[in-house]
Amino acid sequence: MTDLPASVRWQLWIVAFGFFMQSLDTTIVNTALPSMAKSLGESPLHMHMIIVSYVLTVAVMLPASGWLADRVGVRNIFFTAIVLFTAGSLFCAQASTLDQLVMARVLQGIGGAMMVPVGRLTVMKIVPRDQYMAAMTFVTLPGQVGPLLGPALGGVLVEYASWHWIFLINIPVGIVGAIATLCLMPNYTLQTRRFDLSGFLLLAAGMATLTLALDGQKGLGISSRWLAGLVAVGLAALLLYLWHARGNARALFSLNLFRNRTFSLGLGGSFAGRIGSGMLPFMTPVFLQIGLGFSPFHAGLMMIPMVLGSMGMKRIVVQVVNRFGYRRVLVASTLGLAAVSLLFMFSALAGWYYALPLVLFLQGMINSSRFSSMNTLTLKDLPDDLASSGNSLLSMVMQLSMSIGVTIAGLLLGLYGQQHMSLDAASTHQVFLYTYLSMAAIIALPALIFSRVPDDVGTNTVIRRRNRSGS
């Protein structure tokens, strides 16, 4: 990559910083949630909406980001994404109520939704095809470092400054990134087909209303009638999308994707699997601080082994799947993740704190093998004309299921806690015990889906490269 022009290398640095900002923000908030709750005068049971609002917005906006970049230009959209993300960070830091913070996170999510996919498109357009893989490795490396630094950095800032600084640190980086984007990045555009606005609005309405309805009456503060209305609107929107997409060649996501059995199994398993996995990064730091009395910094450090395990497993996951096949790896890793989650809970309640980093490292390894296997299984048999659409749908489902997972985790805490998180330690431990038992059951359920995957031991699991795939 050293033989690339200096201007292209600078453009790759801009994209890399965008990836870093977005990935850092997905984990830096988790450690700060209990401190935020205390500062805002809210129950910790309601703080999951800070994560849900961001991740759900990313899921809703993802389908439009690539089309906007092609239509308006990658520089214009990437600049807009950085500005929105930075402005959202400023508003988050200034928020004095939970509602204000949630709205600011929505603005952040709009920027974050455009930053990563548009960054991938930028690399695709500025780098020669034979150097694309090396360039993508370079720009995605900061995106892998972000989740590693996020929990510890969040803990340091909360413990030695205040939670506001987890958002304020984005502002100078965002300003420099926005200026560099305007000065250095070319504004590539492409001829685009007409955007399926109707399909986009229907899917967005369905995802948003059904996810919010999961939060229930206590989380939203609405009557049963309004809650039923949300569910009805969400279901109607999804049914209308199916009717809209049937036989529609310009649909946002073609229904022909689901004629491929492997794609259908992979997407269904990914959706269900990531609901369970999405609970863990939210619940772990909350349990460590509220249930065990860890400081924010200590809780943040405890999350690092999970990320290290995830990064380490990526190096060998292809060999593992080639050796044992998708079905065995996915079923075993799904049941294993449920078991390790319970092992973490019982080790913590037994006071075996020295074992927790090892358990979290193992949890990260298992989670990484599931994620990689689910992604490749879903896309591996799609024809080239459906690969881009299938990859976009998978990306959207990944974000949606994570937001649902965090919502359900918050719902479980509320169900078992009943606003009594400040009682004696034994009662608090009981709340988290019941929550983790329920989570383990939810994490294990996708094994039923993965058990239907055809046995493919000995076949090559590597996906051939797609021109427009975002994977």
Swiss-Prot record:
One Pfam family hit: MFS_1
Keywords recorded for this protein, A-Z: Cell inner membrane, Cell membrane, Membrane, Transmembrane, Transmembrane helix, Transport
Ribonucleoprotein as UniProt keyword: no
GO molecular function, one term: transmembrane transporter activity
InterPro entries in UniProt: EmrB-like, MFS, MFS_dom, MFS_trans_sf, Multi-R_MdtD
Location(s) in or outside the cell: Cell inner membrane
Transmembrane regions: 12-32, 49-69, 77-97, 106-126, 138-158, 165-185, 195-215, 220-240, 263-283, 286-306, 342-362, 393-413, 431-451
Membrane topology note: Multi-pass membrane protein
Keyword Transmembrane: yes
Gene Ontology CC: one annotated term: plasma membrane
Main location: membrane
Family that this chain belongs to: Belongs to the major facilitator superfamily. TCR/Tet family.
NCBIfam families: efflux_EmrB, PRK10504.1
Protein name as catalogued: Putative multidrug resistance protein MdtD
Gene: mdtD
